[in-house]
Structures are given as structure tokens and as C-alpha cells.
Amino acid sequence: MNALTLNARRSLALLTLAAAWSVAGSAAVAADSYDSAVQHAGRSADDVKRDSLDHPAEVLRLSGIKPGMRVVDFLAGDGYYSELLSYVVGPGGHVLMLNNPSFERFSEGGAVKRVANDRLPNVEHQVLDLNPLQWPAASLDAVFLIKVYHDLYWVDTTGVWPKVNTSAVLDNIAHALKPGGVVVIVDHSAKPGTGSTVASSLHRIDEDYARKDWESRGLKVVGKSDALRRPEDARDHVSYLPPAVGKTDRFVLVFRKP
């Protein structure tokens, strides 16, 4: 397929997607763009099933992202959030669905399938090593780290996960945000005062540590939510294994760059 044909197909896909957004928006009575994204008819049954656990409309609304924005779904896995972000930013926006090689393997082909055949033409699927991350200054409106911020502190001895230069990655994310840009963090809560010390063993991180980590890079907390709280979670089990899986207490923080 030549470049002209591919561009034509993508243009047609964008027009079709824009029309679908328009229809979905007009049909969603009293629904804002975040509810409309969650209610979009193009979403899979598996994704919809996750919504009751992840409450994505509340997280998206708290982020304040708008049509036309450039956003990153960082360590996106299979791209559950990437698709929702695609519907919110619309055909004039851009979503980078980013995985490192390990997360791409974890997705078991889900990320590739999600964007196959230009299904989401405003989503770019990229796989790259995080060492180094070199995004240009003031190039992004938002970066979402959904249950993956703790992984930047994961030290693995089995070869499954490469050691990340965490400080450099966080510095570059802050550098790449436009003034007014936001970082959205959703993660599994560790016990207060544990910092990042259980990131490897329990795949959790302390909320106060996360707040200070981003504030030290000049960002300010501008939003938080208790929508994903589970006060019954003892915070002492591995987040992705029984009995904690699907039942963890999770914090939601939004940071803005001045």
C-alpha cells in the first residue's frame, strides 16, 4: 500500500470516527464528554466490564482533558485508557499509547489489536525503552500513569523487568508538559510511611511519597478523588494476586505544571 492510499484511508477513518463521536455525543442525554467516552458504542465488552472497577469517567473528568489535546497513556498495557482518551481528545487530538518492551509483552497483543486497521486513527502505538526517555519540552498536555507509577520503582531480579532510571524518567515527563499540563496518577496504596519500599514486593506505593515525588519537580496537586478507595484493604498483599486483586485501595491524584 503506498503512502497516498494509506493517508487517504486514515483521513476517511478520522472522518468516520468524528461522525461516530458526533452521533454518540448527541445521543448521550445530559452526558459530558467523559461519560460519552465511557458510553461509546465502539468499546469492547471486556473494557466495559472493567468500568465498574476502574470508574474511568470520574478519573477523566478530574483530569480536565479536552478535545484537541496531546496526551500520553504511559505504560498503557493493552490500551484500555488509550481508547477512552482517544474519544475525549477527538480527531484533532493525539494519544500516545506507550509501552516498554516488558509491558508490551504483558499486554499479550492487546495493544496491537486495539489499533489494528486504523481503528483509532488518533492513537499512536509506540514501544520503546524508557532509558532514556527524551520527549521535547512543552510538547504534552497530559500524561496518565494508571496503576503503573509504582513500576518505575520496581527492582526485578528475574529479568522480567529492566531497571528504570526513575529520576530521569520523571524529570523528562515534567519537562515535556506544557505550562498548565497535568500528570494523572492512579495507583495501589501502600501503608503510610513505606515510601517506594514495597513497589517490588507488593506492587504498591505510598500516596504521600507520590505527592512529594511530583511536587519536588515543580508540579502541584490540583485534584484528588476517593472514587477508588477500599478502606477494608489491609495494604499488605500483592496488588495483582488474590486476595487483593480487584480489591485494592487506590489513590487518584492530578498534578499540574505551573
Residue ranges and their predicted role:
Residues 107-137:
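S-adenosyl-L-methionine
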Residues 232-258:
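Core SAM-dependent methyltransferase catalytic element
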Residues 68-77:
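Conserved class I S-adenosyl-L-methionine
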Residues 133-143, 147:
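A short acidic, Gly/Pro-enriched loop at the edge of an enzyme's catalytic core
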Residues 79-83:
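Glycine-rich SAM-binding Motif I of class I
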Residues 68, 91-93, 177-183:
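Short glycine-dipeptide loop
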Residues 86-87, 160-179:
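A short glycine-rich, Lys/Arg-flanked "PGG" loop and its adjoining helix->strand segment in the class I
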Residues 34-62, 66:
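Class I SAM-dependent methyltransferase Rossmann-like catalytic core
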